Structure formats: structure tokens, C-alpha cells
């Protein structure tokens, strides 16, 4: 998979759980920050990203006929079109993220747990593709 063509799905906690004594609003902000920080880092490296946290804004603005259940279904559909997934810290405490991880495994989509390792893997894939292209040109 070439880096510039790879589509990365972000999975992690979005919905506040109240498990850490944080206010639900602060926990939501913290969770969203994690998604948008990862998205920005990937985009800065030229990687295309599917960020399900973007769908939360439709819920926040009260868009008619858009529910949390629909957002989760939409995420699973988007995941099926991705090449790789990045599990953000705390993913294992989110029922939605665990479902996305199971779906990624079912679809044989590689799941990374570290942004740096994901980027390194994509760069290695780019180099191998370039070597292969050069060999084919000979």
C-alpha cells in the first residue's frame, strides 16, 4: 500500500464513559482532541484519513435524523473502505472502538497501536513500491 494512496481509519473512544472522574464534557473534549491530533499528524505526512470523530459534529448540532447509532453504522461502513487502522489510546474502553477493531480484524485490515510505527510502515511500503517500479522499468 503506497502512503499517498493509503486510507487510514482512526478508532478510539469518543463517547464519555465517566470512568475517570472527569466531567463528561471534559472527557469528550479530551477524546476528540486525541482524534484530531492524530488526523493532523497523518495529513501532515500526506496520508488520507477517515476520522469518525468528524461525525460527532452532526450529533452536536442536532442534525435531524442523525443518531449515535447511525454514526456508529456509518463508521463501520467507512472502515470497510480503509487500508489500515490506527487504534488510539483508550480504544479498549470504548464499545464502539472494540466493534471497529473486530470489524478491522474480520476484514483483515491491519491495526496499528502507535502513530510513529504506522508512519514508518507506510514509508517502508512506499520504498518497496518504488523499488518494484524501478525493477519493472528495466
Regions found by a protein language model. Give the residues of each.
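Conserved catalytic or regulatory cores that recognize and/or transform ribose-phosphate-containing ligands
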Residues: 1-138
Amino acid at each position: 500500500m503506497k502512503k499517498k494512496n493509503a486510507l487510514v481509519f482512526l478508532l478510539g473512544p469518543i463517547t464519555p464513559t465517566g470512568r475517570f472522574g472527569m466531567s463528561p464534557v471534559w472527557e469528550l473534549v479530551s477524546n476528540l482532541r486525541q482524534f484530531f491530533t492524530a488526523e493532523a499528524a497523518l495529513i501532515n505526512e500526506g496520508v488520507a484519513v477517515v476520522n469518525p470523530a468528524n461525525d460527532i459534529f452532526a450529533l452536536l448540532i442536532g442534525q435531524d435524523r442523525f443518531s449515535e447509532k447511525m454514526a456508529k453504522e456509518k463508521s463501520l461502513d467507512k472502515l470497510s473502505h480503509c487500508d489500515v487502522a490506527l487504534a488510539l489510546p483508550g480504544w479498549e474502553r470504548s464499545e464502539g472502538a472494540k466493534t471497529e477493531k473486530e470489524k478491522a480484524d474480520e476484514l483483515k485490515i491491519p491495526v496499528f497501536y502507535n502513530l510513529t510505527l504506522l508512519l514508518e510502515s507506510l514509508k517502508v511500503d512506499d520504498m518497496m513500491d518504488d523499488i518494484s517500479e524501478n525493477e519493472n522499468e528495466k
